[in-house]
Amino acid sequence: MLERCIFLTRQLWKLSEVMQKIIEKISNKSHIWLALAGIVFLSPFIYGLYHEWLACIAAVALCAILLLRLRHNGQLRIQVGVSFAAVFVLVAAYGFSAFWATDSGMALMGFVKFLPVMLFSVVLMQLDTDELGGLLRVVPASGFVMTVLSFGFSRIPLVREAFVVDSRLAGFFQYPNTYAIFLLLGIIVLAQVECRLFLQLIGIAVLLLGILMSGSRTVFILLCATVPILFFATKKKSTRVVLAALAAAGVFGVALYAYLTQNTSGMARFMTTSLETSTLIVRFLYFKDALPIILRCPLGMGYMGYYFEQGSFKTGLYSVAHIHNELLQLLLDIGWIPALLVSFAILRTLFSKNTSRLQKLLLAMLCAHCMLDFDLHFLSMFFILLLTLNWSGGKTFVIKSKSITVTAAAIFSCISIYIGTANLMYISGHPEMAAMLYPPYTSAQIYLLTQTTTAQQMNRRADIILQTNQHVALAYSAKARSAYAAGNFENMIKYKERAIELTRYALEEYIDYINMLQVGIELYTEAGDSVSAEFCRARLLEVPNMIEAVLADTDPIAWRVADKPQLTLPQKYAELINSMQ
């Protein structure tokens, strides 16, 4: 017992010495470095800055940092090279896409969402190369604290759902896959930087446990690829031993857990890793459906355009806001040129001699995961990607004009506060306030449409939506219902068939259409209008053909996933159609 106490005392003493050195190092850092370190450390805890209103807060904070830098130094430095050009074009493209986007209102929200990416890049340019590398050390510290807190909160029933998704630890991201890749990046940093063995052992162990508890199969595969790379890339023998021992213990622990509990969910989800898993197969369906759209739209469809248009071109039963591939997402959102520029900047970094091995490995793993997920929509992950890029080369511009900088910061801040407030109102359950503040806010308008009680209100709200977005099936369905209430079956048919075009796998739309056509046939027959009654009957008889056309267009992959198309009409409707023939 005495020996244990002595051992613990020594370890605590060593830890205190380490903490003292860390404090000394931090005290020597510049204010701008400390501000960026705080953003890199804290932003993952704020939902990873996923929501637009959080991105707006980040934009205002970064504008404030730049203004303070200008005040203290009298100038701002901008290195206009490949990396900055890619970031600038990316953000600008989100803004300009409003002129041709599927939804012009939501396109502006995309600009505000990714504005912090450009501002963060400008702040990075105010640091030296050595200071940039030091920011990466913040990543494992943030992941360590997040894992400890997430595990603790997951044991509290009151808040468990906020940290656990389908028995998988999701961290403060509330998304297990992004949480897992964040921890893997932390492991890579810990294995590559100089630090005490004790801290390295504890840090990697906790981060590895977090990955296992996340149940992310993709990150597990990347982890299996990363460990051998780190093992041979690391010169320190002690680090190699730590990596090998912890990796072996992790795999053995998961296998033992699965064997003893006969449970392959949650932590043991890795045991079901296969190319035939439904979640992986359906992603290939997303990609396959999107490729023709990418070729057809070289300028992209704007922010959220893919989400609103997918109902008209998808060949399976799914509905996703993101395509789960960041390269394809860029192509869909803002087109070929920005996507190619970003890709070139990444490839240039990976093959540059001026890029450290740590940066290359972090960038490679993050990009590999981005090919199967939407990590960069969490801006905290985008910030890490920016830290790994090569910012050298190009021409350096020095901005000394306070009026230009203050004006730009004020414009960006005002736009961010305006859009961010509207988004916050919507997220917090006040869509009427969101729509009042920002009328082109389609998501808020759609919710308000579902709450309308009269045909007139329904028609008016649908018209507001269709002014900025011609691809909302619910709006056309509402106009069809309004026309039906007014007895205008010609318009009802036009709008309902457009709604079906935009949501081809929604069986309820076909059933609703049949019900309205049946009433039309009865009313026209009673009124003695045989021509109109026959027209309605012809459209009703066409419904099975419409369904058959959709089924014929359905990709074989769609039948291999969990959510299969369900387009079989109930028996009474099938009998009704047969009786009309």
Predicted segments, located by residue:
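Alpha-helical transmembrane segments of multi-pass inner-membrane proteins
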Residues: W33-I46, I57-L66, V91-A98, M109-V123, ...
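Short aromatic-rich membrane-water interface segments that cap or initiate transmembrane helices
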Residues: G48, A101-S104, D166-T178, L275, ...
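Transmembrane signal-anchor hairpin modules in multi-pass inner-membrane enzymes, especially those
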Residues: M1-F96, T102-P140, V193-L199, P228-L243, ...
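TM-adjacent membrane-interface loops and short helices in multi-pass inner/ER membrane proteins
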Residues: V282-V320, I334-L340
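Flexible juxtamembrane loops connecting transmembrane helices in multi-pass membrane enzymes
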Residues: R168-F172, T226-V227, V254-F287, I427-H430
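Extended, hydrophobic alpha-helical segments in both membrane/secreted and soluble proteins
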Residues: S216, Y306, E326-L327
